[in-house]
Amino acid sequence: DFEYVSSAKLGSAVSFYLAKDYKKAAEALQYLYTADPYSISLTAYLLGASAVHIKGSARLAPVFLQQALEHDSNNYAAVKLLASLAEKNKNTLQSWQYYATLHALDPQNERLAQKTARYQKELGAKAEDYLYYLRLETPIAARVESVESPTVRMALYGLRGQTAPAVLQAVKLVASGPARVQDEKLGTVKNVSAFQLRQLVYNPQTNAVDIMDGKGQVEFSAKRPFTFVLEQDDRTLLVRDAQTQDLFAADLSDKELKGSLTVIPQAGGMTLINTVRAEDLLPALLAARAQDVREEEALRALAVVLRSALLAEVETNPQAAYHITDNGEVFKFNGINLVFPKLLEAARQSAGVRLLNAASGVYADCGPLGADTITNTQTKPAYVFSPANAAKYMLANPPADLVSKPQDSTQWSGVKWAYWIDAKDVEERLSQKTKFGRLRAIEPLKRTANGRVLTLRFTGSKGEYVAQTPQEISFLLGAGSLRSNFFDVAPFYKGKNIRALLIRGYDTGLGAGLCLQGAQGLAKQGLNYLGIIKYYFPEARLLDTKTGKIN
């Protein structure tokens, strides 16, 4: 049986690897590397980690590690080892990029902070130019028709893993049409022509935000909120070159938006709130979540789910300063500059349709079983889905008729994934929470009926800690890199202490709601977007707000 042969080969390889017999480990891994597409990222990492210690093979290590990331960009261990190798080879730029990536995932880690600061200093003032941020000089979309719909307030530059926006020290704005600056008490204080650059800079001496022209001359200074208002609904505003005290607090990419932009001065800087019509925002939210989904009916289904969740946020908190951030778990906004025609069409053709009586969840990839017991296959497993059988599920390969199977047979990491984690990394993250010591045991305290982990207890030599949410579990185990809460853990001990962890898992997110790749597969089978929604939300009612009809 292929599944058990692969598992046995992996077990042999891990045994040799832990015994530091790296040549034999590499030999055992060769079978998996060529025969098992479901474990290729893990296999490539272990081959790279072994190559470091094999005489004459060290040059192959970065090749294998890059392959590990190509097949699974969440492979934290591969980035960590690449950082170490870049440092050893005295490659300042690569060291900075890899350590910056790790630091962004684990911002409270003092060791990573020191490494990042060291290489940032060596690179100089423009270190941020070497991060993977989108940069734009002028609006690209420039002119996009507006659709009448409820307004949404979205905070820009949302902090990673939080529900608050970053405090900015400076930002630049360029509008594709005429605009005005509106003070909440004084009214219009400045008119700005199309494509004229304006700089907003926090002045610590006055605790105000200065509005400057392209030459740096101050035109207006404000201590209270003011708003950039576009005079024409179909024009756009580019927000660029955002600066914060912490480079890693948020994704500081440039982004083009519709609607108005309110600037809120505060101690230490400013925050930005975009007020925009929901249907104008929706195509950009689709762009951030759709990934490689291109089937029109799948995109329409996603549009309905995101619209439903967005309007629910607005209706639940009508008086909130902002309803969402641009970097939340459900909603991500990278700018309307990334919208392509199919996304506009998906939003327009599903306009007015929303879900009732259903949680509007979305997740990228699904295995045979979702958290809500929705199946993505007609193949019946030889066991019952339960916490006791979670390990069997993790071992089993996806069925041939899985509706969410990837087009590329080597890119299975979203459906089935596996990570090697150094226990020292887990101990470092736990030490941020409590006095912990060495990792001794890991125990799931609460699971769902089919085995998803909800709470997890970590026992250390100096104390213990209970992670209370899937998000916290993912951070403590893998700095947020675990793809879902459907996994099992194999600990490897050295004496009383855990040395390393092998984590095997299925699907992404919490496994509830619309599975994007599943929707893609169902669309290819001929289901329209309403059929896809009924498949993933069988208890939901659909409301057409244009006609008032409920299905």
Task: Identify the meaning behind each predicted range.
Residues D1-S41, Y45-N551:
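Conserved, single-site charged/polar hotspot
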